[in-house]
């Protein structure tokens, strides 16, 4: 029973780390990467769909993305969606769309660091919330006399160790992302 709770908490914390990586992927580092445009939604036959469902997104060079729509009629809509996204990008339109990434200034890098720190803090909060939920479940087992106080204390210590491990992993990934952001 306690082992199931531990496994469940670890799986949920692992999903939180995966979510953190997705959040970090949205933070621009100055190098072109197709995931930068993952959050862009394009109007397509009356509904908004992710850009990667209506176009191929690739890297032309280190500072330029190339977007090749599946349908030529989508070029204007994709161009508009990229311009209106909060990424601060200005695409160049022809048959395909070239998206040059402006060089990051020191100020922009600092802003990106703040965003990365915010993502990391959100991940830590999520991990701590998972810990709180699991500790609550363990206390409920103790109240129902399904486990002893010693088992409850031991399980609480184990959950804390798991939590510390994942919080340290978040810190490690944040440090790596910050180093990547500050690299010119």
Swiss-Prot record:
One of its GO terms (molecular function) is ribosomal large subunit binding. Pfam families: RRF. This is Ribosome-recycling factor. Responsible for the release of ribosomes from messenger RNA at the termination of protein biosynthesis. May increase the efficiency of translation by recycling ribosomes from one round of translation to another. Keywords: Cytoplasm, Protein biosynthesis. GO terms for cellular component: cytosol. InterPro entries: Ribosome_recyc_fac, Ribosome_recyc_fac_dom, RRF_sf. HAMAP family: RRF (MF_00040). The gene is frr. Belongs to the RRF family. Transmembrane segments: none annotated. The lineage of its organism: Bacteria, Pseudomonadati, Pseudomonadota, Gammaproteobacteria, Moraxellales. It is found in: Cytoplasm. NCBIfam families: frr. Its main location: cytoplasm. GO terms for biological process: cytoplasmic translational termination.
């Amino acid at each position: 029973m306690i082992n199931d709770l531990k496994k469940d908490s670890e799986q949920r914390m692992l999903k939180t780390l995966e979510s953190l990586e997705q959040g970090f992927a949205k933070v621009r580092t100055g190098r072109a990467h197709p995931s930068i445009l993952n959050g862009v939604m394009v109007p397509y036959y009356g509904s908004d769909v992710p850009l990667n469902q209506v176009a191929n997104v690739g890297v032309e060079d280190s500072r330029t993305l190339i977007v090749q729509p599946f349908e030529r009629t989508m070029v204007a809509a994709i161009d508009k969606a990229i311009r209106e996204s909060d990424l601060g990008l200005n695409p160049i339109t022809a048959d395909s769309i070239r998206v040059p990434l402006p060089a990051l200034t020191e100020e922009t890098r600092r802003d990106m660091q703040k965003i990365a720190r915010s993502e990391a803090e959100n991940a830590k909060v999520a991990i701590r919330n998972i810990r709180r939920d699991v500790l609550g479940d363990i206390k409920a087992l103790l109240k129902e006399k399904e486990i002893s106080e010693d088992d409850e204390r031991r399980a609480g210590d184990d959950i804390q160790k798991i939590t510390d491990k994942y919080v340290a992993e978040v810190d490690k990934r944040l440090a790596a992302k910050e180093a990547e952001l500050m690299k010119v």
